[in-house]
Structure formats: structure tokens, C-alpha cells
Amino acid sequence: MAAGSGSAAAVAAVAGGGPAGPHAAGVTAGAVTTGSGAPVPGPGAVLIGDRLYSGVLITLENCLLPEHTLRFTPSMSSGLDPDTETELRVTGCELIQAAGILLRLPQVAMATGQVLFQRFFYTKSFVKHSMEHVSMACVHLASKIEEAPRRIRDVINVFHRLRHLREKKKPVPLILDQEYVNLKNQIIKAERRVLKELGFCVHVKHPHKIIVMYLQVLECERNQHLVQTSWNYMNDSLRTDVFVRFQPESIACACIYLAARTLEIPLPNRPHWFLLFGTTEEEIQEICLKILQLYTRKKVDLSDLESKIEKKKLAIEEAKAQAKGLLPEGAPVLDNTSGFSPLPKNESPKEVKGNKPSPLPVQAMKNAKRKAEGAKRTGSNSPVNGVQKGRESRSRSGSRDQSYSRSPSRSASPKHRKSESYSTSSGSKSHSRSRSRSGSPPRQFNHSSTYKSSKMRSYKKSKDYKYSAHKARKSRSRSSSRSRSRSRERSDHSGKYKKKSHYYRNHRHERSRSYERASHRYDRDHPGHSRHRR
């Protein structure tokens, strides 16, 4: 066992020199102390922290707790009064005894479970650990220690029935749902915790056989009534903490003494018979008082005890919350969210950990950006003039510049305006153009007037520019609308459609070179127009 583990065995004052040898079953690393509690250094003593450990002691004796541990328990440090703690100890041991009877466990297994229960709650608090779960874990662990194992499912079913009987309800079978699985996992964890806190020192020396042996020495073993009464007192003493205070020999003498006084059976007193077994009268009287207090106590409802524990848990949680920076009333310290509240605040909390910016304006800006991006995506995916904006035909040269569009888009955002160019196939000289489905006239296009100054030079380079005005008035057919000769008429009508459309809100200062190449290809591929002009 690791020294300083906080278990009952680690803080035990190992008294007496019990039998040690090949039959020893317990291994304890104990701090050897005197009656005053001061450590006694040995030849091979080891100092760990402020405690002096003598080493490893192999013994069959029970581990006894020092007086300061018995006086100030972890439950008292959690705010639980001693009377409530005593009632919880007695109730838990009664549950273990009743469950052992229903599970048909041997009495030694039930006694081991109750002793482990008492030891555990001298290292842990009733407020932080469920009494019922620890009781189940002790029954399951004791059944394996005493070589009479029981399934954990049977242990849960038995405790479930005992709870219904205690609450005077009709017993209902336990449903195997997720709650049952969680309870099973909690019991397994509780069993692990018991082993860890006790340092895996779970050996218990019981006084059952000692009582029979002492009565044989006193020649009273034939008095079955005396033997049975002494045995009963010993079983009742398991509900007290005498097994962590006194050695089993003293407990056996106290049970015989109490049974003989109850049945009025005389025992040798000159000298006193218990002195033969190494027990003092003070120890016997203290053990007898502990046992007799069980018969004078009032029966307490377990629900009342659980309600007290819940109140203590809430008090501890509130204390922890206040220690973490909450207000005295228990309300959390809020950040500076003046933009959120419509009313001004009268006063601010006195203690604030830090002035953090309010997350509300930042979140509002993020939401606005998301809405704007969503609107742009829906606008770009919607068909304009019968063509999806994301789809465009590229010129043969593979230029990255946007080509001149025969059907201008009416999108409100200039970033998403994309134009379509004439697409020519490499195998054939056929040309395809997407039809415009907008409200504008199909044969008239609104071009900005800025094209006259900076872009008309490219038109003049064309050999058919001087006939453009004459041919525009002469032909109104759809085939003639594809020529470049109507640029002047388009520029005349640009003002009228400029007011209606927002396509040329931001003027472009450079025309794509693919338009010039497309115009040369058009003149080369349609020689009929040039002959007609001649």
C-alpha cells in the first residue's frame, strides 16, 4: 500500500504484536504511534511529509483508527452533525445485514461488509458519497472477500426491494433500462473507491470464534442460551464503530460480559475473568455502552436523513459558487452588457473579475454578415436573362478577361456581373449566342456613353465602320443585329436604358480584347456582308 494514501490503514496506529508468519493475510503500512499520538522512530523509519512510517507490518490484527480521526470525521467537516452521522451509519449497516439475509450470505460476509462500511466513512463524507451506493458496494465486495460471490444484479434487486418495503410501497420489479445501467456503473465505481481509500487492506478479524473459545475456557460452552445471547450482542455491535476502536478480543469479552449480566449468570471475579484475556474493565464498559445505545435510539426515517444530506450538498455548492466569484446572493456576476438591457443599471457589482467586451454586438455583426452572404449566394444562383450567372462561355483564346455581352445582366452588384461571349467550335464555324429574356428590347443594347471616347477607337479600326450607320437604318432583321455596324445606334439609345438598368452603374474603362478578336472572326467568317457593302 502506498504510504500517505489517506486510507484507514495508512493512518492506523498499529497496536500490539499479533501473530505474523506465513499465514498472515493482511499487509499494512502503518505509522507506529504511541498512546499520545507522537510517532516513535524505529531503526528503519521512513519520514514522508510530516508522518513517520516504520515500514511494512504483516499482521492479522484489525486496523484501528487514532483518536483524532474518530473525533473529527470528514462528515463533520462537511457540516453534518454527529447525531445524523450516527444514524446514517446505523441505517447503512442495517441495510447490509438485511441484504445479506435476502442474498443468503454467510454471517461472516455480512460482518465484513459492515466493517468495511464503517472504515470507509471515516475517510470520506456522507455528504459527498451516497450511503446506499456504498452499502451495495460493500455487500458485493464482502461477498467476494469471504468466497461467497453474488452477482451485482442480485445486489441491486435486493436493495431495490428493501427500499420499497421501507417506504411501504408495493414491490415492483426493477426495469432494465438506462437508469439501471447507470446505477450498476456507479456501484462498480463505489467498490473501486472503497478499495482505494482502504488501501486494499480489507482483512477483518471477527470475534465469532473468539467468543466460543473464551466460553470454553470459562466452561460455559454448554449453556446454549449464553452462547447465543453473546453471539447476538456481537452481531449488533457491528452497527457501531467499536470495530475501528477496539480489538476483537475486547469486543468478545464485552459481549460475554453483557450477556452474562443480562441472563444473571455469575462469572469469576477474583480476579476478573477478562483480565485473563488481556482486556481492561474500562474498555468493556465503553463497548457495552455503545451496544446498549442501539436499543434506546429512536427509529429515523431514511427520507429525512436524505433530505438533510441534500441541504448540506446545496450549501456546499453555494459556498463553492461564491468562492468562484459569484455575488453574495448567489447571482452570477454578469459582464458589461449595457447594449443588451434597455434600462440603465443603478449600480454595478463591487467585485468583477475583468471587464470583457460584450459578445452581443459581435454576434449581431456576424449574423448580419451571414445574411448578406446568403443574399449574394441566392442572387448569384438565380437565373438572369435565362442564363445562370455562374455559367459563362469563354472565348477560344482562353482569356481570363470578361468578354463583351450581347445580353447585359441586370444584377444590382457589379461584382457578380458576368458577360457572355460568342462561342465558336474548333471543328465547325457555327456560332451560338444565348437569347436575352430581360425586359429590354432584344435588338437594342444599352451601352454607356463612355465607350465613345475610349473605346470607339477600336471600332474605327474595323474596315466596315463607315457603313455602320447606313446599314443600321437599312436592315432590321435578327441576322443584321449581330453585326458591329449598329454601335452608333446603340450609343444613341444608351441614355434611355441607362436610367432603367443598373448594369453600367460602375463604368468599365477597358473593353475585353476578346471582343476585337470576335469582330475580326465575324467579318472573316461572313464574307457576304462585305460583298453586300461593296
From Swiss-Prot:
It is found in: Nucleus speckle; Nucleus, Nucleoplasm. Residues 94-196 are annotated as: Cyclin-like 1. Residues 400-436 are annotated as: RS. Keywords: Cyclin, Nucleus, Repeat, Transcription, Transcription regulation. Its main location: nucleus. Residues 209-293 are annotated as: Cyclin-like 2. GO terms for molecular function: cyclin-dependent protein serine/threonine kinase regulator activity. Contains a RS region (arginine-serine dipeptide repeat) within the C-terminal domain which is the hallmark of the SR family of splicing factors. This region probably plays a role in protein-protein interactions. Involved in pre-mRNA splicing. This is Cyclin-L1. It comes from Gallus gallus.
